[in-house]
């Protein structure tokens, strides 16, 4: 059995590779950038979809941990075994940013939903299984672009900004997303489904930022950001979307995923390793 992992150097790919190795699955790992500290028994391919650097053998599993639209564009010509399964991640941004005030975020939502549909149609046409997860905010191995930058900025400045937000958050660990993808791959029967997948705990945005700060291995000065300052900052196009969502619930309903895959994600209790510190 051969598995191709797309986006293998991403945070999900980082967690997925050792899980596949533990199952005795031969792994081809594709990444756009050379990978340091790569497992020695994984064959690394440098490149990006839809163009691959060399011909591939028939694939039993295709794991998509990179851009979903690129996977959807490449899949029609992919070399798949008759019983192949496609396991990929989209994002809850497909839903949460559908009516965002920023045009680029609305475009991202549309691109994700279009790719989800195209992927499902291609898999149905080719007769292979297709499971797509919509994770919430992913963290855990210091490679995310949401919480890790906050932790590392605090490391440099010893100051931690604390935005106040009433909206609920449900951060999910990259390792739990990887476990869910593997569970979908190893099911006795293929699971053709689009599943929401969040962390094991819902908490306010304010609480989430406070826990990130508490996880740091050094002292910081916590600086609450008043709403008036946030409203002023929201005038900047790059900040408008994130600030607007502070009072919105960005959560997932895990019921279907947990029932189908048997993976229960962990609660949000990060430590310094989650930020690569």
Sequence positions of predicted segments:
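Active-site Tyr-X1-5-Lys
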Residues: 106-131
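N-terminal Rossmann-fold cofactor-binding loop
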Residues: 29-35
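Mid/C-terminal beta-alpha module of Rossmann-like enzyme folds, strongest
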Residues: 183-241, 259-262, 266-277
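NAD(P)H-binding glycine-rich loop region in Rossmannoid oxidoreductase-like domains
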Residues: 36-83, 88, 92-102
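A conserved pocket-lining segment of Rossmann-fold NAD(P)-dependent short-chain dehydrogenase/reductase
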Residues: 152-172, 184
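N-terminal Rossmann NAD(P)H-binding glycine-rich loop of SDR-like oxidoreductase domains
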Residues: 3-23
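SDR active-site strand-loop-helix element
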Residues: 6, 30, 65, 86-92, ...
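Glycine-rich "substrate-gating" loop/helix at the edge of Rossmann-like oxidoreductase active sites
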Residues: 136-143, 164-174, 199
């Amino acid at each position: 059995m051969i598995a191709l992992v797309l986006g293998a150097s991403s945070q999900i790919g980082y967690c997925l590779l050792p899980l596949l190795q533990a199952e005795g699955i031969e792994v081809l790992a594709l990444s756009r950038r050379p990978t340091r500290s790569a497992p020695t028994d994984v064959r690394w391919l440098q490149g990006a979809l839809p163009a691959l650097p060399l011909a591939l053998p028939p694939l039993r599993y295709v794991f998509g941990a990179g851009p979903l639209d690129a996977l959807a564009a490449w899949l029609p010509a992919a070399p798949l075994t008759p019983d192949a399964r496609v396991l990929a991640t989209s994002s809850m941004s497909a839903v949460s940013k559908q009516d965002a005030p920023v045009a680029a975020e609305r475009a991202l939502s549309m691109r994700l939903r279009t790719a989800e549909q195209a992927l499902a149609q291609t898999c149905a046409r080719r007769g292979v299984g297709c499971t797509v997860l919509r994770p919430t905010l992913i963290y855990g191995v210091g490679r995310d672009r949401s919480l890790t930058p906050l932790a590392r900025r605090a490391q440099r400045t010893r100051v931690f900004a604390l935005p106040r937000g009433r909206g609920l958050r449900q951060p999910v660990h990259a390792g739990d997303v990887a476990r869910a993808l593997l569970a979908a791959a190893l099911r006795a029967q293929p699971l053709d489904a689009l599943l929401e997948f969040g962390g094991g705990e819902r908490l306010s945005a304010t609480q989430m930022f406070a826990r990130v700060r508490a996880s740091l291995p050094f002292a910081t000065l916590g600086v609450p950001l008043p709403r008036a300052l946030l409203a002023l900052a929201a005038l900047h196009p790059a900040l408008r979307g994130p600030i607007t969502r502070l009072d919105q619930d960005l959560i997932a309903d895990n019921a279907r995923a947990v029932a189908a895959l048997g993976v229960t994600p962990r609660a949000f209790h990060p430590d310094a390793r989650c930020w690569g510190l």
